[in-house]
Amino acid sequence: MNSEKRLSRIYKENRSGTGKEESTMQVTKTVEETRKQIKAWKKEGKTVGLVPTMGFLHEGHASLIKKCREQNDIVVVSDFVNPTQFGPTEDLEAYPRDFERDSKLCESLGADLIFCPEPSEMYHDPHAFVSIDTLSETLCGKTRPIHFKGVCTVVTKLFHIVAPDRAYFGQKDAQQLAIIRKMVSDLNFDIEIVGCPIIREEDGLAKSSRNTYLSPEERKAALCLSKAVKAGQEAIHAGIPAEELLGKMRAVIEAEPLAKIDYVSMVDALTMQPVEKADRSVLVAMAVYIGKTRLIDNFSYEV
């Protein structure tokens, strides 16, 4: 079953299961109207959960919204393609967008509000940035040097606008999750950060909005990422040192002609710094180009 059919199924299954007789989901486009509504909910003593997204939602996002729905009185989803986290040669303009589709899915999952601002609502030139050093300098940060500065900035702004009790992030973006946790701790945000498991296609490919870029041939080739994850998991449980483990993963990827490795690394789960063996909790992560499309995947190992 393809992703669109599965999303349609999610919509149908959840449409009558949200506990609401009719839809009351709101759509806001400005900071002022968003804050006004959330303040009203908080005045009633309601808890608020936030699911930050860049839209073009898939089943991974749906899992975050479901978890948020379970744990909070109010579910807020932000739907904003954040320009500050894209480099000058990256896919900002090409990034997939379909707000009508996103809205339908959010409504079916019981979201109470979608915040979908224009870039001009979120940023005024010149504007301040938030950055987290060290954690953002490895893995994706090495080849996307401005990415996490943009992520931290927009997430900080969303936290101030929505003032959530909890915020939900997927573990597929494991480095992002670690950076957000560090930022929340360092800047004393009174927000619980909830990490949610990677959601995969039936054949193992991690869900991503960028999967839509892939041709049928590239889609098959992209399975080298999940195959490399499996090889890495087997190696780490066998006690194989990092260098050999990463070599096994690279060999799986390099066997696919359409794949080009950006990085394959083992890092400390907290500091994001490279380690030589799994004698602590580690993250094994990769970024791989399939054709022109950059995909990421990872797995964690807890000690």
Model feature map: region roles:
Residues 248-303:
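Phosphate/ribose-recognition catalytic cores of enzymes acting on nucleotide-derived substrates
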Residues 10-24:
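Short, Lys/Arg-enriched N-terminal segments with co-localized hydrophobic residues
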Residues 22-258, 267-271, 299:
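Nucleotidyltransferase catalytic core that binds NTPs
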